[in-house]
């Protein structure tokens, strides 16, 4: 019995250490991802090369403080991603709500619908109203993306089948240097949105 108790205690301590390491991974990942970023340096290079490319801006903010009744043992982090693009003088904004959770082999991104009652066209962290955790809905179209870390660099992505003929591809790499984001949409196998080079966001 003494041996069993000692073994259980050892397993419990090991579990705590593993959980701690996992949370450290999530914190490291979010430290790279959260903040205010733009690709102005890359945009200027593309302008000099006379290539059509967007001037893009990302504002990423953890928003657990705006979500009520999170489970007591909840360890994930919800994040509002605000994106702003300008191409040939035309401006476009979009926003997403993501949940990041620590998994055994990396960090998982799960997309959620913008909360009911919010304006999808102007949704931001600042405008987000408090919402109950139970009212949040996962996106049925988006395939969760898994990110793995190697030498301080996180890389991952996913492919989502939005409709029988429309496919969305996401690939991202996050490091201290920049956030690299590649998004494309294919319809019937033909790319209708996206660029050859990933957008390189640097912290503002």
Where do the language-model regions lie?
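Alpha-helical structural elements
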Residues: 2-3, 32, 149, 166
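N-terminal helix-cap/turn-to-beta initiation motif at the start of protein domains
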Residues: 23-36
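Short, Lys/Arg-enriched N-terminal segments with co-localized hydrophobic residues
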Residues: 1-22
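Soluble ligand-binding/transfer domains with enclosed cavities or grooves
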Residues: 38-204
């Amino acid at each position: 019995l003494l041996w069993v108790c000692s073994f259980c205690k050892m397993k419990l301590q090991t579990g705590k250490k593993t959980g701690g390491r996992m949370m450290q991974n999530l914190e490291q990942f979010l430290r790279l991802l959260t903040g205010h970023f733009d690709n102005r340096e890359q945009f200027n290079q593309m302008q000099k090369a006379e290539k059509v490319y967007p001037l893009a801006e990302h504002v990423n903010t953890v928003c657990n403080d705006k979500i009520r009744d999170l489970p007591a043992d909840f360890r994930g982090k919800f994040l509002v991603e605000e994106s702003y693009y300008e191409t040939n003088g035309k401006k476009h904004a979009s926003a997403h709500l993501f949940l990041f959770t620590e998994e055994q082999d990396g960090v998982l991104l799960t997309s959620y619908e913008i909360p009911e009652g919010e304006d999808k066209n102007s949704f931001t962290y600042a405008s987000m109203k408090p919402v109950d955790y139970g009212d949040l809905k996962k996106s049925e179209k988006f395939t969760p993306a898994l990110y793995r870390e190697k030498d301080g660099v996180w890389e991952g992505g996913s492919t989502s089948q939005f409709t029988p003929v429309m496919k969305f591809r996401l690939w991202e790499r996050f490091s201290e240097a920049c956030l690299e984001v590649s998004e494309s949409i294919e319809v019937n196998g033909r790319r209708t949105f996206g660029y050859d080079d990933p957008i390189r966001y640097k912290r503002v």
